[in-house]
Amino acid sequence: MATIKDGEYTATIYKLIKDRKYVEAIHILNGQLQKHTKSRAALSLLGFCYFHIQDFSNAAECYEQLTQLHPEVEEYKLYYAQSLYKAGAYPEATKALFALDSPNLHIKMVKLQTCIKYCEEDYSAAKLLLEQLPPDDPDYMFNMGCLLYQDGKHEEACRSFLTALQVLGYLPALSYNIALSYYSLKNYPQALNYITEIIERGIREHPELSIGLKTEGIDVHSVGNTLVLHETALIEAFNLKAAIEYQLKNLKGAQEALTDMPPRSEEELDPVTLHNQALINIDMKPSEGFEKLAFLLQLPSFPRVTFGNLLLLYSKHEYFDLAADVLAENAHLTIKFLSPYVYEFLDALLTCQTAPEEAFRKFDEMSSRLTEQLRRLTKQLQEARLARDDDTQKKVLQEYDLLQDKYITVLMAQAKIYWNRENFQMVEKIFRKSVEFCNDDDTWKLNVAHVLFMQNKYKEAIGFYEPIVKKHYENVSFSGE
């Protein structure tokens, strides 16, 4: 009877693994294990193959059996803990690490413990563990960058990642983290530089991943969630590219970024991709988008912005009852996932449906606080200009733009209360009070124009409409009829 040690089987298995045909190798190895349940070679290769197709639960089962059959081999205990960690079984992974008793594996053990604590959002414990590593260890710089980023220190995180890049050379995950840091700093051109490098290397080095073929209309099969795909950081890079295009209001570019990524079946999609698909296509496929976002909320982990985006999109599409239900059913998520601004805004918006006067008062309080903050930033900007401090000017301007967006959002929601009552004089009054901070904003100008038009103040309305129309001349198409 043939065994895994037989030359024919060994050559076949190793060729399949070399060609990255892990699923076929798994099929043969499972057949061998049915005949020889304690075969060390079969279990070891099977664990390796499962790990590479990211079936970490089955990989963990293989390595668990190996730790029982060969307790003297400390590497199996490490592989078992790594597989549990990758499967999201963090307490079990920590327990498995305690079984390790090898000075040679101590550094790897500390690094894995650090990753576990980071994923458990125990950042202080992760930092303490990380400090056990030598400061010149490239992984120290990489992981310290992650902790700095998590702490909101994006510039410091970026510097840490760039230092690690100099030592380690090109790594897709490291380049992605640098791009993410630049994205958080609103430096989109630099972020796109690193994203482009990830994508171009992926196209050049992994033609089997069918990058961009779906966008071109070519029918392609799923490439699966292999470890190779994970190591290229392509999915993360395309999602970040989509986010940047979305922020730049280039919806077509955002959609293409999602279809350019290596193709996978619906059930293979990760939570971030599902979230971005829902968000970017919400106007064309609202029902599908809401379904995806609601589904994500049921998962043990989901993108942090999912909860807020679902509530805001329900409100945007005037599904206020659904928004209220989601908020009530997930009250425990509000503190963790909603900023005070978003929570207050949603509370006022939902109040509009039953008590518009009370809602107006809530919006007015928010508007007053934002006005104070905008004036403070205006003063800081003037001081930075006098001091010719370019870095401070840049930071303050970014903060001002974000705050102005929030202010205009509150202002429009407040004005809509009177717009719905056709009290256009009151709407105009609200807009006039906000001219100090909004007179350069096209959204504000357009709504001012609308309310003037509704009051038959056509000449004044044209004064607001005309600059906006001229700005968008290139988008106008003419008919020959």
Kindly label every feature range from the protein language model:
Residues 5-35, 45-48, 52-55, 112, ...:
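Alpha-helical segment of the N-proximal tetratricopeptide repeat
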Residues 14, 48, 82, 115, ...:
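Residue-level recognition of tetratricopeptide repeat
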Residues 17, 51, 85, 118, ...:
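Position-specific recognition of the canonical hydrophobic site in helix A of tetratricopeptide repeat
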Residues 20, 54, 88, 121, ...:
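Residue-level detector of the short coil/turn that links helix A to helix B
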Residues 30-36, 64-71, 98-105, 130-137, ...:
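Solenoid-like repeat scaffolds
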Residues 42, 76, 109-110, 140, ...:
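TPR alpha-solenoid repeat register
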Residues 45, 79-80, 112, 143, ...:
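Canonical tetratricopeptide repeat
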